[in-house]
Amino acid sequence: MNKTQEAEEENVFTGDWYSDSAIMLEILDQITFYCGSDRKRMLYTKPGSGSMLYGTTWRGHLKYLPCGKQVLREKCPDTGLFKTKIYSEYPHLKGILKEYSNLYFPDFEWNQVQLNKDFPCPPHLDSDNVGESVLVAYGNYLDGNTCIYRNEKIEKHDARDKPLRFNGSKLLHWVQPIRSEGTRYSIVFFNNPYGLKKNNK
């Protein structure tokens, strides 16, 4: 049984930031990454990397088959919306993310999570997001900082050191490419209007 499956039965994290970062890195290594439809339009990534929404969506179908038939998404009983592909594939990850956020930013409520692997997103605004987001990064790499344009200055943050909280719907932000062999993961906790009921209740 891997750590993702264990989350349903017992706590995963220790309460020590760096130990828990190593645990989260191990968990993320067990996940198969790809790019969701919206992220494919933002940036090309090699197979095995990508950016995926873990949460709910109003889109009831995942894709169309060559025959024209729809592949339907699983319905989320908590919201009445539909689970994203990664949510259906890794349901136990929800408990892990809730435990982690309750440890390190318990005052922040969220209803969606973006999971990223080697995805140096270009400058953008998260126009659909509501309010602030919390970003945390993991991995052994050089550069790969999160850049935020604020007050006519560029801030560079290494989100491996502590959670980074900012309003991505109002502040232009992007990720520096890494310049060494290694893997950069990041998790972004946020809210959007499609989540309706909070996933962390």
Kindly label every feature range from the protein language model.
Residues 1-163, 169-201:
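Fe(II)/2-oxoglutarate oxygenase catalytic core
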